[in-house]
Amino acid sequence: MSGSHLRLRFLSLLLLCCVSSSTSSLFTFSYPVLDLVACRSHQIQAFTQFKNEFDTHRCNHSDHSNGVWCDNSTGVVTKLQLNACLSGTLNPNSSLFWFHQLRFLNLSHNNFTSTSFPSEFGNLNKVEVLDLSFNSFTGQVPSSFSNLSQLTELHLSNNQLTGGFPQVQNLTNLSHLDFENNKFSGTVPSSLLMMPFLSYLNLYGNHFTGSIEVSTSSKLEILYLGLKPFEGQILEPISKLINLKRLELSFLNISYPLDLNLFSSLKSLTYLDLSGNSISPRSLRSDLYIPLTLEKLLLEQCGIIEFPNILKTLQKLEYIDMSNNRINGKIPEWLWRLPRLRSMSLANNSFNGFEGSTDVLVNSSMEILFMHSNNIQGALPNLPLSIKAFSAGYNNFSGEIPLSICNRSSLAALSLPYNNFTGKIPQCLSNLTFVHLRKNNLEGSIPDTLCAGDSLQTLDIGFNLISGTLPRSLLNCSSLEFLSVDNNRIKDTFPFWLKALPNLQVLILSSNKLYGPIAPPHQSPLAFPELRIFEIADNMFTGTLSPRYFVNWKTSSLTVNEDGDLYMVYKNNAFGIDSYVYRDTIDMKYKGLSMEQQMVLNSYSAIDFSGNRLEGQIPKSIGLLKELIALNLSNNAFTCHIPLSLANATELESLDLSRNQLSGTIPNGLKTLSFLAYINVSHNKLKGTQIIGQHKSSFEGNAGLCGLPLEETCSGKNAPPTQQPKEEDEEQEQVLNWKAVATGYGTGLLLGLAIAQVIASYKPDWLVKIIGLFRFCF
């Protein structure tokens, strides 16, 4: 019987194990039981044991690509795929290595904590496809890999593997070899490209040296060698790989300019990336030196100073990246006539305008066009009818945003920040996903129609002359994640109603004319569960904040994990070609400085309430925000002690509580925050000692503070207290002591009624002041 395969979802497989008399039930599942006859019982038990070796809470149980397959005739496991599922240590004695008949194994994107690469993989000598990419494997690839004689695909990319080139030369069936982004070094075997079936080779991001031998009979079609220095003679032999279709040689760090003549013999080449290398100016002027088959050409950061005329002849060109060069002058008119050109980046150059009439743009085939960070002046041209994403920020465009964009039905992303546009925001942007108009001279009110299409994810109109109120129609933006209207002239109360937006992560309202309380009625928590960045600085907000103000900030309460360096980057393949990547920008006060943050981390959490009229205690629930990176409450009227719970904000890097009326001592717990690089508590009423390592300006203006870095010594009446002021215990999940509240309820109620009667009848000033003091500092 032929080796047909029966796909078995691993959850269903575990269900059979759990009802088997030979295994104990650890889980219960509601999934339907599939026909498991093909898998023998000992194979089921081995798989169950393997899965139980790891934490599997990350497993996506609805992902039908994950699972286990058994051969119909033998009943043994021949295919196993657990992608982005497992956490733990892959030990040499793992039951994984019992599956000697495996032909396909995919364990990519897991979180293995092994310190070395298990040599037992070499025992799986029937495996044909092995994917261990995007894990945490370290050390050298064991020599036992040379036993995998049936291997056709080996994926080891994005690990931390070291040592010399793995011993794979005798694996003559290999067609796909991927070592991208590791730490391999040493010499590449000269015969590597002589392997008879090798069609894909990715050595990108390593430290290899040596020369390579090439045969014209090589079947290699895809070759990636870029990012790290590759010492040795490799460029000339590459010209003999006549079957190449994709070639990546970016950032080789070679000392001489590349001559495009090297690639003239590659008649099948469709993709060429030479970014980060110097290109011979002569070869950029002649069309004799470049394959006419090219569809994608990347020449980013190549030191090019004039637009290459060779592009005229590339009639099949679909994508070109000429960003981060030194090209000046005007963008040539013929460029828009290339019949297939759909995506182009000319960003970060010195272009100052367009050659000839810009009307030719309208009928071009362009879908994605980046021309930000140039010196282009004048009115914005009419965009191509096919445009989907357009970025032209950081130029000198002026005049009004043309209403012709209303007829661009495919337009999803419009980015025009840092220009000199005037007039009003067009009413017709309702179908866009990203609107970025920051730092222009736009005026009028925010259009009510912005959310008519319910697709808006980012709206950034900060630093303009916008007036009026925040339109309630923003409630229709159910997909909105990023809203920035800072530094305008908006006059309104705090938009509590925005809490209805389920995906809102960033809310920037700073430097407007907003006023009133920011605490919900009845002192309930502020309900923005997904909010990460909340900036309302320099307005006229007033009132107090309840101790439970931040209780419902669920996203910011999550602990930062190992994936905490991901940016808030949007990738939308709906554009139909290479993903459009957009990075949100915020202006923030961080470590005492005002700065622009162009990339907002997914795990990044910041609060800025500075420059308002807020009073009372700082909410103790602030300690629940474990992801909080920056907190600025300066220039308000907060009183009482700095909450001890701040010590629970373990990711805190910047803390500014200056120019308030805070009293007591600086909590010792702040000294344990390993990331806290900046603290400013100046101009308060604090006493005791400071945190060593900060500048003295961070503590000045507190008459009761003494010791380094201040000049005042701690002696006599200025000696610090022996212990912190006693406060109630502050747990992460409970910010009020409800037992104490319940115990004193009866007595407190009677006393409260009596005091209320006195106040209502006579309102003596002395009693009102006492009640006010207890209200804020109890």
From Swiss-Prot:
<feature type="repeat" description="LRR 19">
    <location>
        <begin position="528"/>
        <end position="552"/>
    </location>
</feature>
<dbReference type="InterPro" id="IPR032675">
    <property type="entry name" value="LRR_dom_sf"/>
</dbReference>
<feature type="repeat" description="LRR 16">
    <location>
        <begin position="455"/>
        <end position="477"/>
    </location>
</feature>
<keyword id="KW-0433">Leucine-rich repeat</keyword>
<keyword id="KW-0677">Repeat</keyword>
<keyword id="KW-0325">Glycoprotein</keyword>
<keyword id="KW-0472">Membrane</keyword>
<feature type="topological domain" description="Extracellular">
    <location>
        <begin position="25"/>
        <end position="739"/>
    </location>
</feature>
<feature type="glycosylation site" description="N-linked (GlcNAc...) asparagine">
    <location>
        <position position="147"/>
    </location>
</feature>
<feature type="glycosylation site" description="N-linked (GlcNAc...) asparagine">
    <location>
        <position position="680"/>
    </location>
</feature>
<feature type="glycosylation site" description="N-linked (GlcNAc...) asparagine">
    <location>
        <position position="111"/>
    </location>
</feature>
<feature type="glycosylation site" description="N-linked (GlcNAc...) asparagine">
    <location>
        <position position="106"/>
    </location>
</feature>
<comment type="similarity">
    <text>Belongs to the RLP family.</text>
</comment>
<dbReference type="InterPro" id="IPR001611">
    <property type="entry name" value="Leu-rich_rpt"/>
</dbReference>
<feature type="repeat" description="LRR 18">
    <location>
        <begin position="501"/>
        <end position="525"/>
    </location>
</feature>
<dbReference type="GO" id="GO:0010555">
    <property type="term" value="P:response to mannitol"/>
</dbReference>
<feature type="glycosylation site" description="N-linked (GlcNAc...) asparagine">
    <location>
        <position position="407"/>
    </location>
</feature>
<feature type="repeat" description="LRR 4">
    <location>
        <begin position="172"/>
        <end position="195"/>
    </location>
</feature>
<feature type="glycosylation site" description="N-linked (GlcNAc...) asparagine">
    <location>
        <position position="431"/>
    </location>
</feature>
<feature type="signal peptide">
    <location>
        <begin position="1"/>
        <end position="24"/>
    </location>
</feature>
<feature type="glycosylation site" description="N-linked (GlcNAc...) asparagine">
    <location>
        <position position="476"/>
    </location>
</feature>
<feature type="glycosylation site" description="N-linked (GlcNAc...) asparagine">
    <location>
        <position position="93"/>
    </location>
</feature>
<keyword id="KW-0675">Receptor</keyword>
<feature type="repeat" description="LRR 8">
    <location>
        <begin position="266"/>
        <end position="291"/>
    </location>
</feature>
<feature type="repeat" description="LRR 20">
    <location>
        <begin position="601"/>
        <end position="625"/>
    </location>
</feature>
<feature type="glycosylation site" description="N-linked (GlcNAc...) asparagine">
    <location>
        <position position="632"/>
    </location>
</feature>
<feature type="repeat" description="LRR 11">
    <location>
        <begin position="340"/>
        <end position="363"/>
    </location>
</feature>
<feature type="repeat" description="LRR 22">
    <location>
        <begin position="650"/>
        <end position="673"/>
    </location>
</feature>
<keyword id="KW-0732">Signal</keyword>
<feature type="glycosylation site" description="N-linked (GlcNAc...) asparagine">
    <location>
        <position position="170"/>
    </location>
</feature>
<dbReference type="InterPro" id="IPR046956">
    <property type="entry name" value="RLP23-like"/>
</dbReference>
<feature type="repeat" description="LRR 10">
    <location>
        <begin position="314"/>
        <end position="338"/>
    </location>
</feature>
<dbReference type="GO" id="GO:0005886">
    <property type="term" value="C:plasma membrane"/>
</dbReference>
<feature type="repeat" description="LRR 9">
    <location>
        <begin position="293"/>
        <end position="313"/>
    </location>
</feature>
<feature type="repeat" description="LRR 13; degenerate">
    <location>
        <begin position="388"/>
        <end position="407"/>
    </location>
</feature>
<feature type="glycosylation site" description="N-linked (GlcNAc...) asparagine">
    <location>
        <position position="396"/>
    </location>
</feature>
<feature type="repeat" description="LRR 6; degenerate">
    <location>
        <begin position="220"/>
        <end position="240"/>
    </location>
</feature>
<keyword id="KW-1133">Transmembrane helix</keyword>
<feature type="glycosylation site" description="N-linked (GlcNAc...) asparagine">
    <location>
        <position position="348"/>
    </location>
</feature>
<dbReference type="GO" id="GO:0009651">
    <property type="term" value="P:response to salt stress"/>
</dbReference>
<feature type="topological domain" description="Cytoplasmic">
    <location>
        <begin position="761"/>
        <end position="778"/>
    </location>
</feature>
<feature type="glycosylation site" description="N-linked (GlcNAc...) asparagine">
    <location>
        <position position="420"/>
    </location>
</feature>
